[in-house]
A protein has these predicted regions:
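Conserved ATP-binding subdomain of kinase catalytic cores across diverse folds
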Residues: 4-281, 321, 326-420
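Short, Gly/Pro- and small/polar-rich lid/capping loops
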Residues: 1
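An alpha-helical support segment within catalytic cores of ATP-dependent transferases
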Residues: 89-102, 272-318
Length: 420
């Protein structure tokens, strides 16, 4: 792309397949770029020299000029010839033109990809780990934006892909509309519940009931759970939008589906319990106790999985989020925005694109809500050095109430459908 080489770097692992990573390069000439304290020094890969000139070779994902060029190329639907294929920039119908003086800023936090905000209107996500094949996030973003018109996810704006001469696609980057937000729902709920538990211990009314504590302390977190249930149900209705596209057309759940899902559960259960059993002797005593308890119910787990395998098929399977938890939800004013449709990172692209029961997403979110209560209680105990029974009781009641509110709102949103 202009003067920026778009490189793919390979990494070979001793016990796994080789991996490919997208690493665009940018050359920054001038001694100021290699001095101690240079702004781009943390992203410098090597020192450059050409005659008397010196400079830095940096990761171009951190070069504002490169980001502007990527945005320009998307808007122009530019194609660049490449080895054994081509690099294709494409803009969706809602593409937002980027001015030359557009502001560029990176999104902080631990991420496996690079997220950049352009002109406070576009969020550019550059994929680091590359996988050949259709990227679920890319096709889902297009479907939800252009077909289902689902409003509670960022609009798809554009994409950057490498397309081989044989037609195989590899997603390099994707652009969405930028949504102003107050952070993710996980942080909002854990922080809110933690503050509420702290307030509980400071109150003089020690005889307050658990239910009154919930009503007086947790209005915001409880409202958020109901709103999230509603938006989740609407997302699943969007995925069930009638379409001729075989990648998104809903299908009846079959006996083979039930059998396959049950076998996947069985395999994962055996793998996890087997690993725990092997490592048990090296665990701390407290952890060994919990592992022993879990291993003691292995037969009950197998019985539960067998019951699932015997369940009669009911409802439809559709595309789903696939990695649904509170960290994938942004709090935006008094609403929620659902993001990150890449699917579970440890699964192949083909597995992530498989249709499944929408209730898989529901189960993932209920588990995430349960984790909120545990995280808030753990944070309280670490800070205080003690854990009053009232604190545990209120956190547990919050979890139960949040789950009920989420499920009630979800079921209201999907009523009169074949989703469940």
């Amino acid at each position: 792309l202009g003067t920026y080489p778009l490189a793919v770097c390979g990494a070979s692992m001793a016990e796994s397949d080789s991996q490919a990573y997208f690493l665009p390069f940018s050359a920054k000439w001038g001694s100021d770029n290699v001095r101690v304290g240079a702004p781009l020094l943390p992203f410098t890969l090597a020192k450059l020299r050409s005659g008397s000139k010196v400079g830095a070779l940096i990761d171009a994902a951190n070069d504002q000029d490169f980001i502007r060029d990527v945005a320009w190329a998307m808007g122009e639907n530019k194609t660049i010839e490449a080895q054994d294929g081509k690099v294709v920039f494409s803009a969706g119908p809602d593409w937002v033109p980027v001015p030359e003086d557009a502001t560029i800023r990176a999104v902080g936090g631990e991420q496996s990809n690079v997220s950049i905000i352009i002109d406070e209107r576009i969020m550019l996500k550059i994929y680091r780990r590359l996988r050949a094949g259709t990227q679920p996030e890319l096709e889902i973003a297009r479907f939800l934006t252009e077909v289902a018109r689902y409003p509670n996810t960022p609009e798809f704006l554009g994409a950057l892909e490498y397309v081989t001469d044989t037609g195989e696609h590899t997603a390099l980057a994707i652009a969405f509309s930028f949504v102003e937000n107050q952070g993710d729902a996980w942080t909002a709920l854990v922080d809110g519940l933690d503050r509420s538990l702290e307030d509980l211990t400071l109150r003089q009314d020690k005889k307050a009931t658990v239910e009154s504590d919930l009503e007086r302390l947790y209005t915001f977190p409880l409202d958020l759970a109901a709103r999230l249930g509603k938006r989740t149900g609407e997302m699943h209705r969007a995925f069930a939008t009638p379409t001729d596209d075989p990648a998104f057309a809903s299908e009846p759940i079959s006996e083979d589906d039930i059998s396959k899902w049950a076998q996947t559960l069985r395999d994962e259960s055996d793998r996890v319990l087997g690993e725990l059993e092997k490592r048990m002797v090296s665990l701390p005593e407290a952890a060994r106790h919990h592992v022993a308890t879990l291993l003691g119910v292995r037969e009950a787990l197998n019985d539960r999985i067998a019951a699932i395998a015997a369940t009669a098929p009911l409802g439809i399977k559709t595309r789903i989020h696939g990695d649904y938890h509170l960290g994938q939800v942004l709090v935006s004013k008094d609403d929620v925005i659902i993001i990150d449709f890449e699917g579970e990172p440890r699964r192949s692209l083909a597995e992530r694109r498989e249709k499944s029961s929408p209730l898989r997403d529901v189960a993932g979110m209920l588990r995430s809500i349960d984790y909120v209560a545990s995280a808030a209680v753990d944070r309280f105990a670490t800070r205080k050095g003690e854990l009053p029974d009232q604190v545990v009781a209120v956190a547990t009641a919050w979890r139960n109430r949040a789950n009920r509110d989420f499920l009630s709102a979800y079921l209201d949103a999907v009523q009169r459908t074949q989703i469940c």
